[in-house]
């Protein structure tokens, strides 16, 4: 049996749960319970704060978990965890920022003895040490942007996705510390256990199949027999399109293929010009 640690709330919780659901790993949640069953009796779920998950997985409390790369770095666990997957969402950057009217415009302007407010004291300290800087770190649990304007700090080190929040709070970015996204990580000892690693890889395979399918579409159509070669040349598909007989019409063939979502518009237009008809474009839940 394996225990999967998932964020109990926050912006990455919903999309992760949706991917697991689409992969077939349905989770039975009852109220505010911290533990849940899945359709697979060998896979249990634990809900926890995303910031605690790196340590839970590292220490073997959970076998596999979902968390942010920034949180792994904050807990200094990235070297002790097996990185399995980058979900490519929940993207953010941890940056140093200063008030717009500050004389600090780059990392070179930061001086020893300055104060910096952050929710990431460990990561901030290690970063500054690498830069040869010794600042007083003020740990906050939220609303970091206000710190320079109430005399708490000279700078902040905070997460930003687009930079809009910084601008709205009259702050300017002076240095990018690290880029982060949502990750699937595993306990290294669990990955060495044949039974546990098999289950973990099963979860990983399911997630990958959903993520891969998100950028694909199944396109189906009927086409004149004398146009099949031309039509199949514009929809190569995965290993080639599928062509089959239509029993009620000897002059037409049915063609199915999987194509990239960003090529649907152009492909459909080309198919219509070549005589394809009854064209259907369908989302795909999983591709294995």
From Swiss-Prot:
GO cellular component, one term: cytoplasm
Entry keyword set: Amino-acid biosynthesis, ATP-binding, Cytoplasm, Glycosyltransferase, Histidine biosynthesis, Magnesium, Metal-binding, Nucleotide-binding, Transferase
MF GO annotations: ATP binding; ATP phosphoribosyltransferase activity; magnesium ion binding
Principal place of residence: cytoplasm
Transmembrane domains' residue ranges: none
Cofactors demanded by this protein: Mg(2+)
Activity regulation: Feedback inhibited by histidine.
Pathway(s) served: Amino-acid biosynthesis; L-histidine biosynthesis; L-histidine from 5-phospho-alpha-D-ribose 1-diphosphate: step 1/9
EC top class, as a word: transferase
A Gene Ontology biological process term: L-histidine biosynthetic process
Annotated catalysed reactions: 1-(5-phospho-beta-D-ribosyl)-ATP + diphosphate = 5-phospho-alpha-D-ribose 1-diphosphate + ATP
EC assignment: 2.4.2.17
Cell compartment(s), UniProt: Cytoplasm
Sequence similarity: Belongs to the ATP phosphoribosyltransferase family. Long subfamily.
Reported function: Catalyzes the condensation of ATP and 5-phosphoribose 1-diphosphate to form N'-(5'-phosphoribosyl)-ATP (PR-ATP). Has a crucial role in the pathway because the rate of histidine biosynthesis seems to be controlled primarily by regulation of HisG enzymatic activity.
Protein name: ATP phosphoribosyltransferase
Organism of this sequence: Methanococcus maripaludis (strain DSM 14266 / JCM 13030 / NBRC 101832 / S2 / LL)
């Amino acid at each position: 049996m394996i225990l999967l640690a998932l964020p109990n709330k926050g912006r990455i919780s919903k999309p992760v749960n949706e991917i697991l659901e689409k992969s077939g790993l349905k989770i039975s949640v009852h109220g505010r319970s911290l533990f849940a069953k899945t359709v697979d009796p060998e896979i249990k779920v634990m809900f926890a704060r995303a910031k605690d998950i790196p340590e839970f997985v590292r220490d073997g409390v959970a076998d596999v978990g979902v968390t942010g790369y920034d949180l792994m770095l904050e807990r200094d666990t990235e070297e002790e965890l097996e990185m399995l997957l980058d979900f490519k969402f929940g993207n953010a950057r941890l940056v140093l920022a200063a008030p717009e009217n500050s004389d600090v415009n780059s990392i070179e302007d930061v001086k020893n003895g300055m104060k910096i407010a952050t929710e990431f004291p460990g990561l901030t300290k290690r970063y500054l040490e690498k830069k040869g800087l010794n600042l007083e770190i003020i740990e906050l649990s939220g609303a970091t942007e206000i710190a320079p304007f109430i005399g708490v700090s000279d700078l902040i080190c905070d997460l930003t996705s687009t930079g809009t929040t910084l601008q709205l709070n009259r702050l300017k970015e002076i240095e990018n510390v690290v880029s982060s996204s949502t990750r699937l990580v595993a306990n290294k000892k669990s990955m060495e256990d044949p039974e546990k690693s098999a289950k973990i890889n099963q979860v990983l395979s399911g997630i990958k199949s959903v993520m891969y399918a998100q950028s694909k579409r199944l396109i189906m159509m009927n086409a004149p027999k004398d146009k099949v070669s031309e039509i199949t040349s514009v929809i190569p598909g995965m290993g080639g399109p599928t062509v089959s007989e239509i029993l009620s019409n000897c002059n037409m063939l049915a063609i199915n293929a999987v194509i990239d979502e960003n090529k649907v518009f152009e492909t459909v237009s080309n198919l219509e010009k070549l005589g394809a008809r009854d064209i259907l474009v369908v989302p795909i839940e999983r591709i294995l």
